[in-house]
Amino acid sequence: MDQSDIRSAFFVECEDLMEALNEGLDRIEDTLDDGHDDETVNAVFRAVHSIKGGAGAFKLDALVRFAHQFETTLDALRAGRVSADPPLLALLHKAADRLSDLLQAARTGSETATIDPDDLVAQLAQAAGEEEAGEADAEDLGFVPMRLDLDLPAAAPDEGQSGCYSIDFSPTRALYACGNDTSILFRVLSDLGRMEVRLDRSRLPDFDALDWQESWLDWHLTLETDEPEHQIDEVFEFVEDLCRLEIRPMAMEAPRTDPDPEPDPEPDPPASGPAAAKKSPAEDHRTSSPRATVRVELDRVDRLINIVGELVINQAMLSQCVQDEGVPPRSPVRNRLDDFRNLAREIQESVMAIRAQAIKPLFQRMSRIAREASEISQKQIRLVTEGESTEVDKTVIERLADPLTHMIRNAVDHGIEPADRRLHLGKPPVGLITLTAAHRSGRVLIEIKDDGAGINRPRVLEIAQGKGLVAQDAQLTEEEIDGLLFMPGFSTASVVSDLSGRGVGMDVVKSAIESLGGRITIASDPGVGTTFTISLPLTLAVLDGMVVDVGGQTMVVPVSAIVETLRPRPADIHVLGSGDQVVAIRGSLVPIVDCGSIFGFRAPVRSYEESVLLLVETARQKLCALVVDTIHDQRQVVIKGLENGYGRIPGVAAATILGDGRIALIIAPEEAVDIGTSGGTFSMEF
C-alpha cells in the first residue's frame, strides 16, 4: 500500500468519524435539558482527535490547526469548565461543518484559502475560556517524532507514595488506525510516577506470515505512583475499547531498573488480594471490537452486480429453452432449474444489499443545510429525522442530495413563518421540519414535512397566470394548482436571495426524482403545513416488471407503477369534445393513452374491447390508463441503460434482455402519460 492509498483510506475513515461527530452533537443537543452524557462528549472528542491525528500525518496544517482548537473546546466541555447550552451547541455544529469543508478541500486537493477557519477558531477559543489561538500555539500542533526514555522516572516520587500497579496493555490494529500513539500514552503514565516498561514480542509471527496491518506487540508496565487509580484509568479513557487492558494493584514494591531480556510468563492470579483485576470492555478484542468490515471500490461492486445480472438473464434464457423443448413441468430438469432460479435471485439480492446504504449520512447533511438556511433567513428551525437506518441504493442516495437540499431550503424560506408571526398564530416560535424515510411496498418513501404556513394556492395561481403558464380564466383544482409548482421557471419568491428566487426550483427537483424512477406528491393544509412525499425504487439495477405486447413489440411496464389491470367494456369508453378518450372506472373518468400509438408502432386503436388497460398512478395526471395489446407475464428484469448508446428516448426508461434473447424496452409511465395526454407521438425504428 503506497502513500496515496493510505491517504485515501484516511479520508474514507474520516467519513465515519464525521458521521459519529455529527451524531454525537445531535444527541447532546437532544438531551440538553437533561444534561449531556459524558460518554457522548467523549465520543465526539475522540472523533475530532482522530481526524487531527491523521491530518497531522499528512501535513494538512490548516486542518490540524482547526481540529486542535475544536478539540480544545470539546475538552473544556467534557472537563466541566464550560457548560453545554444552545449557543455552544450552535457553535460546535458550525465547527463540525467547517471541519467537513476542510476535509473535503484536502481530499479533492482544492485550495483551502477560500475556507477561512480563523473566525471560528477565535470563537471556539473564546467559548473554551482561552485567549485567541496565535502563533505561539504552533509548537503544540507539531508532529515531530521524539525519543522517549521511559525507563527514567519523570520525577522523584513523593514521600507519601503509596500505590503500585501492574498494567498489561495490548493495542489492536484499530487503535493505530484511529491515529493513536502508544508512546504518548506511556509518556503521560510516566508523569504519574516511576514506571518500568517491558515489551512482549512473543506473538510476532515469522516474516512470511506477518500481516503488517495487524498489531502483534504487548506491553507490560509497572507503575509506582501516589496518584489515585482513576488517574491511571483516565490515561486509557479514549483507547480502552481499542485495546486489551488489565490494571492490577500490587503490593508496594519498587520497580526494577533493569528489565529482563525476555518477558516473564504471566503470573497466576492470587487466590486473594486487595482488589479484583480491572479489565477494559475490550479485554477480548476479537469479540468486543466492531464488526469487521472490508472497504471495496464501488466500481468493483458494480462489476459484480453486472455479472450477477447476466447470470439472471442466462437463467431466464435457460428456462425459455427448457420450455421450448417441451420438458415436463415436474421433471428433474425443471426442479433443478427452479433451484437455479431461486439461487440466482438470492445471489442477486445479496449482491444488491452490498450497494445498500443507510440514509443516515444524507439526513445528517440535511441537518447542516437546515442550520445554514435558518441562519440566512433569521428563522428558528428544528429539523427532526426519522428512519435514518432505512437502506437505499448508494446511487439513489447520491442523486437525492441536490433535490433534498432544495426542498429543505424551500421549507425554511417559503414554509416556516418568522418567530413573531408564529407566536401571533399561536404556534411555537421554533418551526419544525420532519424528514422521514421508510420502506413500503418494495419502495422507499421519503417525506419532507413542515408545520409552516402551507401553500397559498390563490397566490400560486395568480403568479402562474401572470407568467402566462395558465389561462387567465382557468379554473383549477387544488391538486392542479399544487402541480404548478413543478413547472419550469415557476417561483413564488419576489426577491432573489441565497435561498430562492432564481426560477430554478421544483421542476428540477421533479426531474431529478423521476430520473431515479420515482414520483413526488404534495399535500398542503393552509396554516398547518406542507408535506412532500418522494417515492423511489429500492435499487436502480433490477425491477419487477410486467411484460406486455404493444403493436407487435414486447415492452416492460414497472409493476410499482401499476395500480390495476382491466379489460374495458365498450360502454365504459367515452369520447370528450376534444376528441380525447377516457374510461369510466367506479364513477371517475380516467384518461386513456395508447402506447402503440405514442411510440409509433401502429395507428391509434379505435376499439379497446380486445386490449388491456394498465391503470398507472402519476404525479401530474393521477390515474391514467395505458393501452397494451396483451400481457405475457410478470418477472424480475435487469435494467440496462440506453443513454450511452442511444441517448435519451422519450417515454422509455431503459431496456432489458428477455429469456429468449430479445431486447425489450422498459416504459417510463410518467413520461408516456405526459406524451399521450399532450397529444404527442414518438416514432422508433426497429
From Swiss-Prot:
GO cellular component: cytoplasm
Record localization: Cytoplasm
Start and end residues of each HPt domain: 1-106
Record-linked SMART domains: CheW, H-kinase_dim, HATPase_c, HPT
Enzyme Commission number(s) from the entry: 2.7.13.3
Reactions catalysed, as given in the entry: ATP + protein L-histidine = ADP + protein N-phospho-L-histidine
The entry's keywords: ATP-binding, Chemotaxis, Cytoplasm, Kinase, Nucleotide-binding, Phosphoprotein, Transferase, Two-component regulatory system
Limits of the CheW-like domain: 542-678
First-tier enzyme category under EC: transferase
Kinase in keyword set: yes
GO terms under biological process: chemotaxis
Residue positions where Phosphohistidine is found in the record: 49
GO molecular-function term, one example from the UniProt record: ATP binding
Keyword Transferase tagged: yes
Renumbered residue ranges of the record's region Disordered: 253-293
Histidine kinase domain boundaries: 290-540
Described purpose of this protein according to its UniProt entry: Involved in the transmission of sensory signals from the chemoreceptors to the flagellar motors. CheA is autophosphorylated; it can transfer its phosphate group to either CheB or CheY.
The name this protein goes by in its record: Chemotaxis protein CheA
Gene: cheA
